[in-house]
């Protein structure tokens, strides 16, 4: 039987460019909605938008957070993001080292 998942989550969103990803990541970490933001530049996305298949160069932003921050994180991301419909995908972290989980939890919460 698999072990229960940790309270850690990874949120994926894409941005128009590295500058926007850095701005969003910094704001969300400063506001303690994310413990860490990792930027992966130069990804290529292919998607359907308003009936047409589109392609765009984007920056992938990975946000490490906890279950208790997800609602506020999504709301704040929607406020700050330039996209009309920003991506907000949540991945469950099945396992992580206890020191990392301790750090993550201590980095979240009230500023």
What are these regions (language model features)?
Residues 1-111:
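Positively charged, small/polar-rich N-terminal and surface patches that mediate targeting and assembly
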């Amino acid at each position: 039987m698999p072990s229960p998942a940790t309270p850690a989550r990874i949120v994926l969103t894409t941005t128009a460019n590295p500058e926007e990803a850095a701005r969003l990541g910094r704001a969300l970490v400063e506001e303690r909605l994310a413990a860490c933001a990792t930027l992966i530049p130069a990804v290529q996305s292919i998607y359907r938008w308003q009936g047409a298949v589109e392609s765009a160069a984007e920056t992938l932003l990975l946000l490490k957070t906890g279950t208790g921050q997800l609602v506020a994180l999504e709301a704040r991301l929607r406020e700050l993001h330039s996209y009309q419909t920003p991506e907000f995908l949540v991945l469950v972290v099945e396992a992580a080292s206890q020191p990392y989980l301790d750090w993550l939890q201590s980095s979240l919460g009230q500023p």
